[in-house]
Regions:
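Class I SAM-dependent transferase core
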Residues: 1-50, 96-97
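Conserved SAM/SAH cofactor-binding pocket of Class I
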Residues: 42-117, 123
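A short helix->loop->beta-strand "cap" motif at the edges of active sites that frequently abuts
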Residues: 75, 143-144
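A short SAM/SAH-binding and catalytic strip from SAM-dependent methyltransferases
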Residues: 120-130
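A short glycine-rich, Lys/Arg-flanked "PGG" loop and its adjoining helix->strand segment in the class I
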Residues: 133-142
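Conserved beta-strand signature within the Rossmann-like core of class I S-adenosyl-L-methionine
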Residues: 144-151
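Conserved class I S-adenosyl-L-methionine
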Residues: 151-161
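Single conserved hydrophobic/aromatic residue that forms the stacking wall/gate
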Residues: 163-170
């Protein structure tokens, strides 16, 4: 198995183990995580090819941040999560699978945040598009963009926002 595939597998196994006691996500099997979480992120890997810094906020159990950090070891990732048990898990997972390009913060992103600037800001299933952008736009480089993962039931109008790449996940 390739190194990246081994890291993803180790991440999923650790996630399932922690999930039994920490209730990190709804999924309870490896296949559910692959079908409902990992497959959402895979189509967008190429969006990151020119980035040097990425903020993933509201990362939950580490998706998409951990997966993107595995795929792009030369990009520096900051993964921010406001729920302590989830931030602890993400930090533990990053150490467990040997991600040297990842910094995990237990923090809430707001208009007063002083992180960054970042080439790309991502989040998945966190708040509204308007709230996401309003809370973090000051953290984005001038040439950067938001990559928001929203389900089919969520409507994003990218024309309404500068620096937004909207992608519908299955």
């Amino acid at each position: 198995m390739r190194k990246k595939a081994k890291q993803v597998d180790a991440y999923i196994e650790l996630l399932l183990r922690y999930n039994t006691t920490h209730n990190l996500l709804k999924r309870t099997t490896k296949q559910e995580i692959i079908d409902n979480d990992i497959k959402d992120v895979l189509p967008f890997y190429n969006e990151f090819k020119d980035a040097k810094t990425v903020l993933d906020y509201g990362s939950g159990a580490g998706i998409p941040g951990i997966l993107l950090a595995i795929e792009h070891p030369n990009i520096n990732f900051v993964i921010a999560e406001s729920i302590q048990k989830k931030a602890f898990f993400i930090k533990r997972a990053a150490q467990h699978i040997g991600l040297g390009n990842t910094k995990v913060l237990h923090t809430r992103i707001s208009k007063r945040s002083t992180l960054g600037p970042f080439d790309i800001i991502t989040n998945r299933a966190v708040g509204t598009t308007k709230t996401t952008i309003n809370n973090s736009q000051q953290l984005l480089k001038g040439s950067g963009f938001f990559l928001l993962f929203k389900g089919k039931e969520k409507t994003i109008n990218p024309v309404s926002y500068t620096h937004l790449r909207a992608h519908e996940t299955p």
